Amino acid sequence: MHRWLFVMLALLPGLGLADERVKVCYGYGCLVQADVRYSDGQLGDVRRLLFAAVDAAEERKMLALAIGRLYAWAGEQSDIHNDRGGNYADGGIPGKMDCIDHSTSTTRLLGLLAERGYLRWHRVREIEARSFAWLIPSHWSAVIEEKTEGEAPRFVVDSWFVDNGQPAVILPLDEWKKGAGPDV
């Protein structure tokens, strides 16, 4: 009986949330996918950051920082540490990311945070595109939606605008669709 109890107590720490793996795209159009591992310690840091938020607006501010940190840690394990904001500053370096890479990877990172219960005021939505002259899709971004009654406001979480490891740009979806965002 005591041996069984000892074995159960020894296994107890392993019953918590384990390290997580996420595929991060790069090379333009998700040509390359790196398997990135986030430790319990790193995810605990992100959890504490997000749980410091007192409302949805504050959660978006913390989420911008969290996405930047997650990309920085991914850059320690892959070539994406070379990625620069926009497309023009990348040059021919390995690890460059276009908006398809960013929107796909950021949506995966947001999904990880949602699955762990770290997003209290937002839910993850599908990737959105904005178009040039209302015809040709020209830019894609990850999207979150505020958890509210009635018409829920949506926001883009756009890491494409910034260098690797910097806070993501979070804007109202409607403004982003009209071209809002840093000039890169």
Segment roles from a protein language model:
Residues 13-15:
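N-terminal signal peptide c-region/cleavage motif recognized by signal peptidases
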Residues 19-35:
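Short N-terminal segments immediately surrounding and downstream of signal-peptide cleavage
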Residues 42-76:
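N-terminal, post-signal-peptide region of Sec/Tat-exported proteins
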Residues 111-176:
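Hydrophobic/aromatic-rich core segments of domains that either
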Residues 67-122:
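Mid-length scaffold segments of soluble, non-membrane domains
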Residues 1-6:
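Bacterial N-terminal signal peptides that target proteins for export
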Residues 32-33, 49-60, 85-100:
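Second-shell loop/turn segments in exported
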Residues 179-184:
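Low-complexity, Gly/Ser/Thr/Pro-rich intrinsically disordered linker/tail segments
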